[in-house]
Amino acid sequence: MSQPVYALNLFNVANRDEYLAYSRRSATEVKAHGGRVIALGKFHEAIVGDMAPRNVLIVVEWASRQDFDSYCNDPALVDLHPHRVNGTDNYIWHLFDKLEDLRPILKDEA
């Protein structure tokens, strides 16, 4: 059985019109490919860390890595993804495996 993955998207909007062209269609396409936006946020404050802040946060839960890949590689969306690229800058896009708890990370390797 495939495990869900979470896509963390952090970015700045660089071109409003380009990003609007992306966002008008992306929500429907994300859902059609097994994704669900679970968090949207606007930068508020840096507490700890040395990463340059990004203005936008989006977290998408994908049913599986395969669903994420199908969204990224679907030939029917070849005209969509360039709007994201051209509408943003300083983009960070990381995938995280879903965990029920931290035991897989904290277990003793000894």
Model feature map: region roles:
Residues 78-88:
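C-terminal structural segments of small proteins and small subunits
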